[in-house]
A protein has these predicted regions:
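Positively charged, amphipathic and often flexible ligand-engagement surfaces
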Residues: 1-174
Length: 174
């Protein structure tokens, strides 16, 4: 995931690669930053395209990491801000995206990158509602190493798929 002024090109490449390589299952994943106010529409487009072209969608859902930079750049360049200015709207869109992914699990694999307890509980409830096994390989919980360990460890202990992600590189870059 990158800033909005870079992400569209990444999205185009990721979609082309999903269409080419995700014929039987998701191998290629892209990140959706749900603090962007256009991501639900993007997700809906991606789901429609995957159905039409018969490929699997691989997604990591996150809230977003470049909020201040996005707002500043939009002001500097004079365009509409591409991110939600209220965190509640980001939370709403994150949970909506999570719901859309689980409702379309027949052709979606999702990694729920969240430190938010409510979204984690929602994912568990959605899996139960749709009779999806806790250890279904299409669904993962993910948290940054050293953060929200209570979510990671409790979900793993309960039998859910959990990964910790580790930023790599100089501290100033990660």
């Amino acid at each position: 995931a990158e800033e909005s002024w870079i992400q569209n090109e990444i999205d185009d490449i990721a979609i082309a690669m999903m269409e080419k390589f995700n014929k039987k299952e998701a191998w290629i994943f892209n990140t959706l930053q749900l603090y962007r106010n256009d991501r639900i529409a993007h997700l809906e487009m991606l789901l429609k395209l995957a159905k039409e072209k018969n490929f699997f969608v691989g997604l990591k859902l996150v809230r977003g990491a470049y909020h201040e930079q996005e707002i500043e750049r939009a002001k500097e360049k004079g365009y509409d801000c591409p991110v939600h200015t209220a965190k509640e709207n980001t939370d709403i869109d994150y949970n909506k995206a999570l719901t859309l992914c689980i409702e379309n699990i027949d052709f979606v694999s999702v990694c729920a990158g969240t430190h938010n307890e409510e979204s984690s509980v929602l994912l568990i409830e959605l899996l139960e509602k749709h009779s999806i096994s806790k250890d279904d390989k299409r669904v993962y919980f993910s948290q940054l190493l050293g953060m929200s360990d209570h979510i990671s460890y409790n979900a793993a202990k309960a039998g859910f798929n959990v990964v910790k992600y580790v930023p790599y590189g100089p501290v100033k870059d990660v």
